[in-house]
Regions:
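Bacterial N-terminal signal peptides that target proteins for export
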Residues: 1-8
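Bacterial N-terminal signal peptides
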Residues: 9-18
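N-terminal Sec/ER secretory leader and immediately downstream segment
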Residues: 23-129
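Short, charged, amphipathic alpha-helical segments
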Residues: 103-107, 127-128, 167-170, 192-199, ...
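Extended amphipathic alpha-helical interaction segments
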Residues: 132-215
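A cross-kingdom marker for long, charged
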Residues: 214-263
Length: 263
C-alpha cells in the first residue's frame, strides 16, 4: 500500500492520511500517539491517526473525492474557509493518485490565494504541485500542499489577518472530518470511531469563532458553522456510536456544502 497523507494545516491542524501494509492493531491507544500542541490543546498528530485508520481497512479514496465549487469572488471569510477545504481535498486526490484532480486543485489554491491577496506567496508552490503531480511524485506533492497552506497562513498573520488563518484551518478540518467519518462509517469499528474523539480540538475551534470581531462572528456562514460545531460537541464528548459517526458526517457535509455555496 502506498504511504500517503492528507494535510489540513495552518495555525491549528495538519491532517495526514497514511497507509502501509501491517496487521490491524488489537486496540488503538490514542494516549501513546505523538502529539502536537495548539495553544493549550494537545492532540494526536493526525498523520498517526490516519496511519491507524488505514490499518483498519482500505478506503476507496477516489470515491471520497468531490467536485467543489470554486468561488474566487465574495467575502473573505468564505474564501478562507474554502481554501482550507480545497487543500484537504488535494490530499484526498493524492491518496487516489488522481493526477488531473491534483493539478486542478493546485490551480484552485492559486486562484483562492489570489482572491485574498496572497497569490505571490504560493505561486511557486502551486506550479510545483502541478509539475510534480504530472510526474506522479506524490511525496513531493504532499510536501508542496503542506507548504502552500503554511505559507498562506504566515502571510495572513503578517497582514494582520490571523482570524482568516483560523478559518483556513477550520475549513480544512471540516472537510477532513467529513472524509474521516465517511471512511469510518463504511467500515465501522470502535477503534475507528475513537479517532473522532477530539473534544479539546473542537473546543479550540469554537473558542476561535466566539473570539472573532462581531463583523466576522455575525457573518451568516460563520454563524452556521458555529451552530454546526455546537451540534457536533455532544456527539464526541461521549462514546462514539455508529449513529454518532453518521450524524457527524451529515453535519460536516452540510457545513462543507455551505462553504461551497454560502447557503
Amino acid at each position: 500500500m502506498n504511504r500517503c497523507r492528507i494535510v489540513f494545516v495552518t495555525t491549528v491542524l495538519v491532517l495526514a492520511i497514511s497507509g502501509f501494509a501491517e496487521a490491524p492493531p488489537n486496540h488503538i491507544d490514542l494516549s501513546k500517539f505523538p502529539a502536537t500542541q495548539l495553544d493549550d490543546v494537545v492532540v494526536p498528530l493526525p498523520s498517526e491517526v490516519f496511519n491507524v485508520l488505514d490499518k483498519l481497512g482500505t478506503p476507496n479514496w477516489q470515491g471520497e473525492l468531490r467536485e467543489p465549487v470554486i468561488r474566487n469572488r465574495g467575502e473573505r471569510t468564505q474564501i478562507a474557509l474554502m481554501l482550507g477545504a480545497v487543500v484537504a481535498e488535494g490530499f484526498v486526490a493524492v491518496e487516489a493518485a488522481d493526477k488531473g484532480r491534483v493539478q486542478q486543485i493546485g490551480r484552485d489554491v492559486l486562484e483562492l490565494a489570489r482572491a485574498i491577496g496572497v497569490e505571490s506567496t504560493v505561486l511557486s508552490r502551486t506550479n510545483s504541485i502541478i509539475t510534480k503531480a504530472d510526474a506522479g511524485n506524490w511525496v513531493a506533492v504532499r510536501r508542496e500542499l503542506d507548504g502552500a497552506l503554511t505559507d498562506v497562513k504566515n502571510a495572513m498573520i503578517e497582514l494582520k489577518d490571523a482570524q482568516l488563518a483560523h478559518l483556513v484551518s477550520l475549513g480544512g478540518w471540516l472537510r477532513g472530518t467529513e472524509v474521516l467519518t465517511s471512511v469510518v462509517q463504511k467500515s465501522y469499528s470502535e477503534d475507528g470511531a475513537d479517532l473522532l474523539n477530539q473534544p479539546d480540538l473542537l473546543k479550540y475551534f469554537q473558542e476561535r469563532l466566539a473570539g472573532m470581531p462581531p463583523r466576522m462572528r455575525n457573518n451568516q456562514l460563520v454563524t452556521k458553522i458555529q451552530k454546526g460545531l455546537d451540534e457536533i460537541s455532544p456527539l464526541i464528548n461521549q462514546k462514539i456510536t455508529p449513529g454518532s459517526v453518521k450524524r457527524i458526517n451529515e453535519i460536516t457535509g452540510q457545513m462543507v456544502k455551505a462553504i461551497d455555496t454560502r447557503a
